[in-house]
Every structure is written in structure tokens, then in C-alpha cells.
């Protein structure tokens, strides 16, 4: 029989940092609210959660990396919103935020969760921050809890 390992959704003392971009704040605040509510519902003491605000999604990876390297957190949740405009700037920001968060996770072996919306319109971003399409902040927080509880099991 194969061995199956998976995390669960019980915080059980795990510590979390959230790195939140302020750009498109009307969207990112809803993502943050969803993430914090989810962490609390699964047992987190919000007094033990750190929220780091950065100017925008471009700055998220470096702040996430600093958090991950402290050793104080079992997972880092990245929340932001990038909405396509008329120039290639959207592509550069999305690419940098995506690769930066993934590289941070790989380099530090701390789960760094990608809750950065990359949408064509503001309405799409709003829908993914709590209206029609759920709340991607909640989903990122659930994934963070699951990964935080899985990682110790992988250390063998």
C-alpha cells in the first residue's frame, strides 16, 4: 500500500504572515478580510498573525522572502490585484509577482501562497475578492493552512 501524506485545515499553533499589495486596495482589502476570517475560523489567533502592507504586487515577493527567511512563519500568504491596462506593464508585474513568489517558496522551503489576482477588468477582480467568484483570499489561506500542516510530515 502506498503512503499518502496530506495536510489538514487545523491551524494548531502554526504561524502565518500575509503580504498585501495596496494597489487596487478596494480589492485587496476584501482578499485580506477573507484570508483573516478563514485563518481565524480554522483556529488561528489573529494576534499571532502578521500582516505586511506593500505598495503593490511587484513588491510582494521581496517582502514575502524576508518573512519566509525569518523562520517565524509556517506559511506566507501573498495577496494582490493586478488589472490589465493599455500597456505591457500588466504582463511585467504579473510575471515578476508570479515567479518571485514561487522562487521564494522554493528557495526557503516555506510555503508561499499565490493569492494575487491577475484580471482583465476591475469587475473580474471584485468578483474574485468576494462576490460572484468566491474569495481568492480565503482559498489562499486554506491552502496555506494545508501546506503548513503538510510540510512537517514531509521532513520524514
Curated annotation (Swiss-Prot):
SUPFAM superfamilies: Lumazine synthase. (2S)-2-hydroxy-3-oxobutyl phosphate binds at residues 86-87, 128. One of its GO terms (biological process) is riboflavin biosynthetic process. 5-amino-6-(D-ribitylamino)uracil binds at residues 23, 57-59, 81-83, 114. Its EC number is 2.5.1.78. Gene3D superfamilies: Lumazine/riboflavin synthase. One of its GO terms (cellular component) is riboflavin synthase complex. InterPro entries: LS (IPR034964), LS/RS (IPR002180), LS/RS_sf (IPR036467). Pathway: Cofactor biosynthesis; riboflavin biosynthesis; riboflavin from 2-hydroxy-3-oxobutyl phosphate and 5-amino-6-(D-ribitylamino)uracil: step 1/2. It is an enzyme of class 2 (transferase). Pfam families: DMRL_synthase. Belongs to the DMRL synthase family. HAMAP family: Lumazine_synth. This is 6,7-dimethyl-8-ribityllumazine synthase. It comes from Salinibacter ruber (strain DSM 13855 / M31). The gene is ribH.
Amino acid at each position: 500500500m502506498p503512503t499518502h501524506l496530506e495536510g489538514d485545515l487545523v491551524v494548531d499553533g502554526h504561524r502565518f504572515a500575509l503580504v498585501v499589495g495596496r494597489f487596487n486596495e478596494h480589492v485587496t482589502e476584501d482578499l485580506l478580510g477573507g484570508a483573516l476570517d478563514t485563518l481565524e475560523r480554522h483556529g488561528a489567533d489573529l494576534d499571532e498573525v502578521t500582516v505586511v502592507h506593500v505598495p503593490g504586487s511587484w513588491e510582494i515577493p521581496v517582502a514575502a522572502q524576508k518573512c519566509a527567511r525569518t523562520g517565524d512563519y509556517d506559511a506566507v500568504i501573498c495577496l494582490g490585484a493586478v488589472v490589465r491596462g493599455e500597456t505591457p506593464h500588466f504582463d511585467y508585474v504579473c510575471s515578476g509577482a508570479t515567479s518571485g513568489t514561487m522562487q521564494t517558496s522554493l528557495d526557503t522551503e516555506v510555503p508561499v501562497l499565490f493569492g494575487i489576482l491577475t484580471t482583465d477588468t476591475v469587475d473580474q477582480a471584485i468578483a474574485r475578492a468576494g462576490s460572484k467568484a468566491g474569495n481568492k483570499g480565503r482559498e489562499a489561506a486554506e491552502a496555506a493552512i494545508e501546506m503548513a500542516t503538510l510540510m512537517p510530515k514531509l521532513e520524514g
